[in-house]
């Protein structure tokens, strides 16, 4: 028997969240307002990331463009058939949730 998960209501619009602390309707608005603030330099990649952000139902589905200057502890791993592979830590960290008070994304970085 399948029992659907019930999430709390969004603090912003008061509708039921689509994921844990995730309101698709409100986050679509927040992502769209931020489109002008970043670019990969490639329109196709930008569109792919933007489409992903608009269709995500919870934070684990969200892709973001990370500029090189937002990475640290960059470490070369190996060379493959299509390029070199590196790993790094992200200064800002991934999106945790929308902070209604500060009107910005609350983020979680690699160190904490």
Please provide the spans of the model-predicted regions.
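Intrinsically disordered, low-complexity regulatory segments of kinases
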Residues: 1-112
């Amino acid at each position: 028997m399948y029992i659907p998960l019930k999430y709390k209501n969004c603090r912003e619009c008061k509708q039921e969240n689509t994921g844990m602390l995730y309101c698709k309707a409100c986050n679509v608005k927040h992502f769209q307002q931020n489109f002008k603030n970043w670019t990969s330099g490639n329109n196709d990649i930008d569109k792919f990331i933007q489409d992903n952000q608009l269709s995500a139902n919870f934070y684990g589905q969200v892709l973001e463009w990370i500029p090189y200057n937002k990475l640290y502890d960059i470490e070369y791993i190996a060379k493959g058939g299509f390029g070199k592979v590196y790993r790094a830590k992200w200064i800002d960290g991934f999106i945790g949730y929308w902070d209604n008070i500060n009107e910005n994304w609350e983020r979680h970085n690699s160190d904490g």
